[in-house]
């Protein structure tokens, strides 16, 4: 039996040192907690990695999803094609905006939308394709972009689970109209616990996103967008009354304001991104090197061809014929202080909050997402794991599956 670790190994975990602490203290000592230089620099850095010219930092990845989808300004009842294996807010954002999700099954070993099943689901009201880079793997975005161009659809890349990906040598965001990401603790880096970002190339869309990020007020594009630096304190209401533009509300907005403290923390984390990703990949490779000897018991995760990425977690499927029960496996791992998780929602239409939503689905259902929902689990690969931690997980898996 493997030696017990000195601590529980959670499915996610951030790491920091004095550099993050000092960056946050510098903002506190300045006495100015408003959106400032740190947010601006962070937006520039992350949008570049996403393959975009412009970025808008927000308070979470879920806020980024709601803002990003909303930027398309679709009509109620319009449709967005998406994966049925996903995270809850990918779909709740679609529904909350009065839109209809059109679901496509996944490839079970990649956990990504089956791009070969997208075209058959396009209908007269379909306006966009939006799907996640689930668990850090990615679908073939070249195929998605080609389908979108053929049918006049917009493309949104949900890259909450991974940052810094390339497909066939180029940033994946080069294929999207909008890309977005998250800085939750479980993700590639964090802004002291949370944060998100919407990225785009269109300056007009950027201004719209800024406006909606903070209450819908007109001043946002003058403070942070294409009109920055213009002397425009006063402006006319529709009836001609001159008014302070900080209190002119041109749109229906939210309060998704990011934190200057979080951005300062995130900039330090961003400088460590390659190190973090390398640590994640090391854990993934160690687990894979072991489980490749047990393919009679498990279906291994498969990275999309010609993709450079870093898996957020190591997900695998227990073969139904193997005799391994998932709950028993998870209890075995957790009894040994290795925490595990499901692969996100599974088939989201089987989740209580989503079973009754308006949607469209293929006639043959979602057999692959159902397989993931019943037999898949994922284990930690996060950059907070040390080499001894990873070795302990390998030993525990070896004990579980017999050497």
What are these regions (language model features)?
Residues 1-71, 75, 149, 246, ...:
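Conserved PLP-binding active-site segment in aminotransferase class I/II-type PLP enzymes
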Residues 64-69, 90, 94, 196, ...:
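Buried hydrophobic packing segments
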Residues 157-192, 207, 247-248:
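Conserved active-site segment immediately N-terminal to the catalytic lysine
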Residues 70-159, 166:
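PLP-dependent aminotransferase-like
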Residues 56, 81, 102, 155-156, ...:
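Structural detector of well-ordered beta-strand residues that form the stable sheet scaffold
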Residues 92-94, 147, 171, 188, ...:
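Hydrophobic/aromatic ligand-binding patch that stacks against planar heteroaromatic rings
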Residues 39-44, 52-55, 116, 128-132, ...:
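PLP-dependent aminotransferase class I/II
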């Amino acid at each position: 039996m493997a030696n017990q670790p000195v601590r529980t190994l959670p499915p996610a975990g951030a790491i920091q040192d004095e550099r993050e602490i000092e960056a946050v203290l510098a903002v506190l000592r300045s006495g100015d907690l408003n959106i400032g230089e740190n947010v601006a620099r962070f937006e520039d850095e992350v949008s570049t990695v996403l393959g975009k010219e412009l970025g808008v930092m927000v308070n979470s990845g879920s806020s980024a999803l709601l803002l990003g989808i909303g930027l398309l300004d679709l009509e109620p009842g319009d449709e967005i094609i998406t994966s049925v294996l996903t995270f809850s807010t990918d779909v709740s954002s679609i529904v909350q905006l009065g839109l209809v999700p059109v679901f496509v099954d996944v490839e079970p070993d990649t956990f990504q939308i089956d791009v070969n099943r997208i075209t058959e689901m396009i209908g007269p009201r379909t306006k966009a394709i939006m799907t996640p880079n689930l668990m850090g793997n990615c679908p073939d975005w070249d195929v998605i972009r080609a389908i979108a161009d053929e049918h006049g659809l917009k493309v949104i890349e949900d890259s909450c689970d991974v940052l810094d990906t390339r497909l066939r040598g180029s940033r994946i965001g080069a294929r999207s109209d909008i890309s977005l990401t998250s800085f939750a603790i479980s993700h590639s880096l964090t802004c002291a616990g949370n944060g998100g970002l919407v990225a785009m190339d269109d300056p007009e869309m950027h201004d719209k996103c800024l406006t909606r990020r903070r209450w819908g007020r007109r001043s946002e594009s003058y403070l942070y967008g294409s009109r920055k630096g213009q002397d425009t304190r006063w402006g006319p209401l529709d009836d001609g009354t001159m008014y302070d533009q900080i209190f002119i509300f041109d749109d229906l907005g939210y309060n998704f304001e990011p934190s200057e403290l979080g951005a300062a923390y995130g900039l330090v984390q961003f400088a460590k991104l390659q190190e973090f990703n390398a640590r994640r990949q090391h854990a993934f490779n160690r687990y894979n090197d072991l489980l490749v000897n047990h393919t009679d018991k498990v279906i291994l995760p498969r990275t999309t061809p010609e993709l450079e990425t870093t898996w957020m977690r190591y997900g695998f499927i227990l073969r139904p014929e193997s005799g391994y029960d998932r709950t028993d496996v998870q209890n075995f791992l957790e009894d040994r202080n290795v925490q595990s998780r499901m692969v996100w929602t599974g088939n989201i239409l089987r989740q209580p909050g989503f079973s009754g939503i308006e949607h469209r689905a293929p006639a043959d259902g979602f057999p692959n997402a159902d397989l993931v929902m019943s037999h898949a689990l994922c284990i930690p690969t996060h950059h907070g794991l040390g080499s001894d931690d990873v070795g302990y997980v390998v030993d525990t898996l070896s004990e579980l599956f017999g050497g």
